[in-house]
Amino acid sequence: MLPGEAPAAYVQRVTGLKLQASLARLKRRGLPPAPVLCADTTVALGRRILGKPATADEARAMLASLSGQRHRVMTAVAVGCLGEQAGEPARGWSGLSESWVTFAPMSEREVQAYV
């Protein structure tokens, strides 16, 4: 995440980078032009992005922070295709889906059961 980057901008940027890397790989391998679909999803509690927990303790802490809270789940998608002719630029389209989710309050025992 870049300093001061909003969650929506972050997920769109990451998805765009995935698309660029995928199109570059197609070109590098000399494969014929084909549509490439990339996506990324992030959860944000306010402006704080919640990444994938690496440990059970992190998962418990994340669920506890979401307990009783309203947060956003954002998925960015991007579709691109290399140009048909050599030197023709790639074309692309992108979009963002944003959903608001409210977790019911969870006890410590309920959080533990999820993990």
List each model region and its residues:
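Anionic-ligand binding patches
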Residues: 2-115
